[in-house]
């Protein structure tokens, strides 16, 4: 609203070009509301000093979890979350899933289900994949049943998937900021 007022000159001042306007924020998660508004009104912008909110790794990961729940056909989302956090599903296991999905002309989620039913995968990876697939199905049902509002469901998905816990256990200096970004995303 403030930016539109400056641009249109509705506060008793002449209209101003936004080319030389800057917004300073203390923490990166504060940029989200600005970015949302800029995208809504079609205002081009640049973020200096860090990536845009929706380009951050943790936001893209979280969005992939939310996308796979709304569409289990979303192979890009599944590829992003299958081993995030680590589930013991390395490149070989992921290649087997891709081959099975291609063989049956189906999604990666369905390919993973087929692979598990054929007992092609073993060990920790198979157990963790089974848990992930059953969680995705359960989250889909919760979404359909409208058992939770969207904020509660997003928090539940990120918690139960282990994604929030991964960042809580991370001891790098970036981890607290990433957790703040996740909180900002779901609120």
Annotate the PLM regions.
Residues 101-114:
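A short beta-strand-loop micro-motif that forms or neighbors metal/cofactor-
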């Amino acid at each position: 609203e403030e930016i539109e007022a400056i641009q249109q000159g509705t506060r008793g001042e002449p209209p101003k070009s936004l080319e030389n306007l800057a917004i300073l924020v203390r923490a990166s998660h504060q940029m989200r509301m600005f970015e949302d508004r800029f995208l809504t009104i079609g205002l081009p912008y640049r973020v200096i000093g860090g990536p845009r909110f929706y380009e951050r790794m943790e936001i893209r990961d979280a969005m992939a979890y939310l996308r796979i729940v709304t569409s289990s056909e979303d192979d890009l989302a599944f590829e992003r979350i299958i081993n995030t956090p680590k589930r013991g599903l390395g490149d070989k296991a992921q290649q087997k899933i891709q081959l099975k999905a291609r063989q049956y002309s189906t999604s990666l989620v369905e390919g993973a289900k087929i692979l598990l039913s054929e007992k092609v995968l073993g060990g920790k990876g198979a157990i963790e994949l089974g848990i992930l697939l059953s969680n995705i199905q359960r989250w889909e049902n919760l979404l359909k049943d409208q058992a939770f509002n969207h904020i509660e469901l997003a928090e539940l998905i990120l918690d139960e998937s282990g994604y929030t816990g991964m960042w809580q256990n991370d001891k790098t200096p970036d981890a607290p900021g990433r957790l703040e970004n996740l909180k900002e995303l779901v609120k």
